[in-house]
Amino acid sequence: MQIVIPMSGFGERFRRAGYSVPKPLIEIEDKPVIAHIIDMFPGESNFIFVCNQEHLNKPAYRMAAILKEYCSSGRIVGIPPHKLGPVYAVRQIEDMLDQTRPVIVNYCDFTCYWDWGHFKQFVRDVGCVGAIPAYQGFHPHSFGNTNYAYMRETGGWVQDIQEKQPYTSNRMQEYASSGTYYFATARIMSEAFRSAMEQDLNVGGEYYVSLAYRPLLANKQPVAVYPLQHFMQWGTPEDVAEYNMWSRAFRQLVATTVVKSQTMGTVIVPMAGLGQRFAAGGYSLTKPLIPVSGQPMVAQATHDLPPAEQHVFVLRSDMQGHREVTTELTRLYPKAIIKTTDQVTEGQACTALIGLDAIAEELGDVPGPITIGACDNGALYDLTAFRSLVGDPDVDVIVWGVRGYPNAIRHPKMYGWINAKAGVIRSISVKTPLDSPTSDPIVLGTFTFRRAEDLRRVVERLIDRDGRINGEFYIDSCINDAIALGMNCRLFEVDSYLCWGTPNDLLTFEYWQSCFHKWECHPYGLEKDARVSQNTIDFLKFRYRATCPALPALMK
């Protein structure tokens, strides 16, 4: 296979974001992006790298040396800087191609999990003049604002393709090109590229490979879709940051096994919400029992809270699966207090107060510190650092937070934001972002109070002043009351925030768990993850197994 990789663009977005090397040389998983692209084609040696000559000329980039390190047989061609797109770049090296042999043009800002051998067999069996690897359905990067090349298809055959905009309002249900483009011969590619430029098929002055299929489709030539299981998008600084966040989290899940021996204080887990989004999404189990890594969600969430002497869980009596949840919690935490409320509360702060009252009634004195945590998220953090903060007698309240969480950046009005300096919290802004959502910390929904009476005081003060946000009393808001009462409130930043609070949150976690488990470039594996229930590993391996697409339907 002849493989051409146009990499002559400027990468302005990365430059503006502070990156010091061109996009193909940015390191991800300990090697440059271009190395991941080369790895997509195991056993191949006929590569042509079409580079920006200015990049080749800059000694600090070492572009030619890096390309030779990862592909010694590759041919490196420098062309003058331009803004005409990848079709123009590839046309500069057309005379280097065997016009009778197949060719792939591959962009330089992504990778995917696929079977290269299967793809080659697929195009041979199908007999198409072109094929486009693409993804459809749930892929987390599609939640961003970037649009790609989208296709109309019938039975696996492309009917139309357009750049930078979907055909419908539900782009996840459309096939989007990954950035790999196959042509049965280089001659077919060259003629398609020439036609595309003659017809002025460009977007913003750039000629994209996707649009070169339009002349082929107009002539009723068969172009197939090749569905992909996992796709890693690194086209923008935001894409890279989000990918790295998930990669770090799953690396940390298998890096060390934390032995939580010393227990202290109380953990209260409010779980009196309705969980309507999961029910609407077709989940039959009530939210706390939905499996995460083979364990009930509430068990995974509680596992990530500090080891405690006493646990309190607050449930609604009319919660679907109330009996099953109670049975499971009793099995996991035999000494736990399970408090039932007969109605939906007015918010997390009120539910936490119910839990505090329950343990006070049971034990009299409430063991401190008291940590309130949600039933639908986990966190990876330095337990020693947390205990050091708890051990500081000057600290009254600890607010758990994290920076750079992608969903908060996309939807800043859905989160609480922490205004802190040198770890000391000045205020909490609930559902209203601060100056810089990309770097300001958000509230996880986990809080630690040194004394039970302080928790009670701030919640009662919040209720007295009717400090509702969107009709609910949030513990986020209580922190402002704590500050007003003179309490020393400190920020505790976690390493990774694992959110399962909505169906999309859970699907995103499972997407990356599935991808990293299979992908040899990542160290994660289900069998290495101590949070994965041992008796469900085989089930999860089967669920996450590699898939290869079937052949398309016969063309009519």
Predicted regions located by residue number:
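A structural signal for short hydrophobic beta-strand segments in well-ordered beta-sheet cores
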Residues: 25, 150-153, 225, 289, ...
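Short glycine-enriched, charge-decorated loop/helix-capping segments at active-site entrances
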Residues: 19-25, 197-199, 283-289, 463-465
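Active-site glycine-centered loops adjacent to acidic/histidine catalytic or metal-binding residues
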Residues: 9, 109, 136, 236, ...
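A short acidic, often aromatic-flanked loop/helix-cap motif at beta-alpha or helix-coil junctions
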Residues: 81-86, 138-140, 231-234, 343-348, ...
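Conserved alpha/beta core of the MobA/IspD/sugar-nucleotide pyrophosphorylase nucleotidyltransferase superfamily
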Residues: 3, 174-267, 440-555
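Alpha-helical elements of Rossmann-like donor-binding domains used by nucleotide-donor carbohydrate transfer enzymes
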Residues: 91-92, 118, 212, 242, ...
